[in-house]
Amino acid sequence: MREAVMVDYIAKIKPINADKIETQVHRIATFSENGNSLHIHVEMFDTPANIEHWEHFHGFPNGNQAHVPTLMQDVNHDGFIDLPETEAVSGTTMVPFDDAPQEMNIPHDGYLVADKYGHYEYDKDVPLKDLQAKFK
């Protein structure tokens, strides 16, 4: 019997619209694939305080490289990089970091709220089988 191999991924989180929100969000997210489970851990600092954060990752289903959007993606020229404007370079919203990521239900109120210091921590084990079924 083959032993399950753990695979780790690391995402460096970079802020967008930092000059507008007047904070420099920072942290690294880790993703650990271990057998039938994906463990997601994200701890955020200096986010806008006391609000819910729709945290998720973006990507391309075909495996193309995703990039952090810049003001070049601000197609409506309002000075903000809006979520729909990110898709050309960052891909689509793939997996939400909410109360049930495997459900792939993006718009709802099940995301974390930052405390008064702009801190929050997300720690979740997600069944890979359920998550993979949403990508078929």
Where are these regions (language model features)?
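N-terminal leader/targeting pre-sequences
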Residues: 1-136
